[in-house]
């Protein structure tokens, strides 16, 4: 029987790329996963396991894997990019000449372009041109839980409604809900900022500051998301949904969160280099904290938690000093109307 479903190429054989490739393959979409590490790709293609990033979890036998990018995207109806933010631009530059006209590109990468601070949709539009359908996949989702088939909900945002729905349809299933929207800026902002804020919560947990401190930091962190969203063209309801609040809660409370684990290690007194080495995977917040503050400073928005995280990750202050700075801030109204008064101070 001929499979009439779209062929999907997933780029990035880390934990998240593998999880998403396995997800759509289980939904009977012909799927091929591309990655650079020959050993990882061979383990996926032959043994149906990603021994490095998702050990001991069996992947669908229908999922194919390759290190040949041209072979991966050949005949693909659309492409899903799931590489770290530092590799996003380079991956799209390699992808662009291989794409057929009309082939859409979605990405599950969270963060900004390192160095420039550009949103990833801006990078994608510049490289892929004005006609390529684009979408971003984001929301509270640990790769391991998705691969194990545990219930998950994400959101897909894009300006092209048909392509956005196509991506969501491929992912949506009995244990995986995919919602849709068209606020690309808000979706990307939430996915980037939550990583920075998770470091602060991790630090507080590592310092054993208690559950009250955790709740306060999460709530005021959401306030920072909303504040920045109001001046860069994002919609506040996006940040109150899966792309913002949902992802923030998961990343700040889940032990699988690399960014929270980094903060926890720093709060326990570990050095930044040792903590990153122990985690063994990319920790997006190290780069993203600079880019978040770049946007805040360009727009005159005060983000004290994000600013403290940046200073800690730059090793300009200790985690203890960072918490003291936050606790010493002047008392003021909570400003529940921050959705409309973006420039009032926290």
UniProtKB/Swiss-Prot annotation:
It is found in: Cytoplasm. It comes from the Bacteria. PROSITE patterns: NAD_G3PDH. Pathway: Membrane lipid metabolism; glycerophospholipid metabolism. GO terms for cellular component: cytosol. Belongs to the NAD-dependent glycerol-3-phosphate dehydrogenase family. It catalyses: sn-glycerol 3-phosphate + NAD(+) = dihydroxyacetone phosphate + NADH + H(+); sn-glycerol 3-phosphate + NADP(+) = dihydroxyacetone phosphate + NADPH + H(+). This is Glycerol-3-phosphate dehydrogenase [NAD(P)+]. The active site is at residue 194. Pfam families: NAD_Gly3P_dh_C, NAD_Gly3P_dh_N. Sn-glycerol 3-phosphate binds at residues 110, 139, 141, 194, 247, 257-259. NADPH binds at residues 15-16, 36, 110, 143, 258, 282, 284. GO terms for molecular function: glycerol-3-phosphate dehydrogenase [NAD(P)+] activity; NAD binding. InterPro entries: 6-PGluconate_DH-like_C_sf, 6PGD_dom2, G3P_DH_NAD-dep, G3P_DH_NAD-dep_C, G3P_DH_NAD-dep_N, NAD(P)-bd_dom_sf. Keywords: Cytoplasm, Lipid biosynthesis, Lipid metabolism, NAD, NADP, Nucleotide-binding, Oxidoreductase, Phospholipid biosynthesis, Phospholipid metabolism. Its EC number is 1.1.1.94. Gene3D superfamilies: N-(1-d-carboxylethyl)-l-norvaline Dehydrogenase, domain 2 (1.10.1040.10), NAD(P)-binding Rossmann-like Domain (3.40.50.720). Its main location: cytoplasm. Catalyzes the reduction of the glycolytic intermediate dihydroxyacetone phosphate (DHAP) to sn-glycerol 3-phosphate (G3P), the key precursor for phospholipid synthesis. It comes from Xylella fastidiosa (strain M23). GO terms for biological process: carbohydrate metabolic process; glycerol-3-phosphate biosynthetic process; glycerol-3-phosphate catabolic process; glycerophospholipid biosynthetic process.
């Amino acid at each position: 029987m001929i499979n009439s479903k779209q062929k999907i190429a997933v780029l990035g054989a880390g934990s998240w790329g593998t999880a998403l490739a396995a997800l759509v393959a289980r939904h009977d979409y012909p799927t091929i996963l591309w990655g650079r590490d020959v050993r990882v790709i061979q383990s996926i293609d032959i043994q149906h396991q990603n021994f490095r990033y998702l050990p001991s979890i069996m992947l669908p036998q229908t999922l194919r894997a390759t290190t040949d990018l041209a072979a991966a995207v050949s005949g693909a109806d659309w492409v899903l990019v799931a590489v770290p933010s530092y590799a996003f631009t380079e991956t799209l530059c390699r992808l662009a000449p291989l794409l057929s006209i009309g082939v859409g590109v979605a990405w599950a990468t969270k963060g900004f372009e390192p160095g420039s601070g550009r949103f990833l949709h801006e990078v994608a539009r510049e490289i892929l041109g004005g006609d390529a359908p684009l979408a971003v996949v984001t929301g509270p989702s640990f790769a391991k839980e998705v691969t194990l088939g545990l219930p998950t909900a994400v959101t897909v945002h894009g300006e092209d409604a048909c392509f956005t729905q196509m991506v969501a349809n491929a992912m949506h299933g009995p244990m995986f809900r995919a919602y849709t929207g068209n606020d690309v800026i808000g979706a990307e902002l939430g996915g980037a900022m939550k990583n920075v804020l998770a470091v602060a919560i991790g630090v507080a947990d590592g310092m054993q500051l208690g559950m009250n401190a955790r709740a306060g930091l999460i709530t005021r962190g959401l306030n920072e998301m909303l504040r920045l969203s109001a001046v860069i063209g994002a919609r506040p309801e996006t940040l109150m949904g899966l792309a913002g609040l949902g992802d923030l809660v998961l990343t700040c409370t889940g032990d699988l969160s690399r960014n929270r684990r980094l903060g926890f290690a720093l709060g326990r007194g570990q050095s930044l280099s040792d903590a990153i080495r122990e985690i063994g995977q990319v920790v997006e917040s190290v780069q993203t904290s600079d880019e978040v503050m770049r946007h805040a400073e360009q727009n005159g928005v005060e983000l004290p938690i994000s600013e403290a995280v940046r200073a800690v990750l730059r090793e300009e202050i200790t985690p203890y000093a960072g918490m003291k700075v936050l606790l010493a801030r002047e008392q003021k109204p909570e400003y529940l109307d921050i959705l409309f008064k973006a420039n009032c101070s926290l």
